[in-house]
């Protein structure tokens, strides 16, 4: 079952489970709720962190049922959304984020620094301000992975460090 590797043998050092890779919110509610229940059954786990781009690109995925299930959990629930530009943060996203916050889900953001998309100080400031308006804490800023066909988005480490320093 889910969580067997975390709890057999018991590893009390594990306090947080992260659902990531692909997109966990692409699961059906039934699948996701089953997974959450399995995680809740692990006594030493205190936090559930869900990484997802769907609240940004498909905010309708954030349903009342999903939010109620997360609020019902004894786990501290954190959702890390993936927004890269302030223009992604429209009214529907604001409503989805408000619903999550109303159900005690902490919201963090993960951005990828992309050349010619968000690699200016102005753009990053606008993104951060918009995230704060939506109740989302800017948290992670990554450089792009080296994947075939994406070299035109690459920002070098020195450029990234320079932007963060400003």
Provide a role label for each language-model segment.
Residues 1-7:
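Glycine-rich active-site/cofactor-binding loop and its immediate structural neighborhood
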Residues 7-16, 25-166:
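Conserved AdoMet/S-adenosylmethionine-binding subsite of the radical SAM
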